Amino acid sequence: MEYRYKNIYLGETIEEIFSELNNSNTEYKRSTFVLLYRPYENIEVYIYLEFGKVRLMKIFDENFQIDNTLKVGIALTDEIVNRYDLYYDDFEEVYLSKKHKELVVIVDLADNIIGFSFHLELVGDEAFATDRIKNYLECKNLQDIYGSLYWSKTLDANIEKREIYGQLDNYKFTFDIITRDIKSIQNLETGEFVKISLNK
């Protein structure tokens, strides 16, 4: 099964999609550290900045279909449930698939299909905000100190400048939004730059 809507696909990197992002179609969601990209009226694309990839897509386009039997606007029948090995998730109030882990079927109260989600589950260490190094002043990439930055609740992003920001103690960290590599570390008390990347 292909997890794609027009030219956007699940797992696509921010580098591949970045030229399409702008302030009118993309919004930074601080609480989840994602860019919410709306390239078309009936789709939401979630770019997880920690990984730099599309990890969630929500599609509500009335003309969208995965194949001839699974499409928006039709009733969810027993045949479809069995074919895709679907089961109802009471917490999320959607149908998940045992056969296609990335597929979510969204239905209304009458069990008519109103949309789909494609998602990549977080596995292993991805599911937890952790650090890879102890001394955050030695970080080379956002993932090195992501846990500390996440828990500090200081993460921010700027699409126009192509940067991700975070603060620990009195240090401001600036990362490239595409590679997530460190661009600079600034001591906010002195204004001095502790580290500036060669790529800046």
Please provide the spans of the model-predicted regions:
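Acidic/histidine-rich, surface-exposed loop or edge segments in extracytoplasmic proteins
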Residues: 1, 57-61
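Short glycine-rich, polar/acidic loop-and-turn segments at beta strand-coil junctions
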Residues: 51, 61-63
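A cross-family detector of function-defining hotspots
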Residues: 12-56, 71-200
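Short, recurring structural edge motifs at helix starts
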Residues: 2-7, 64-69
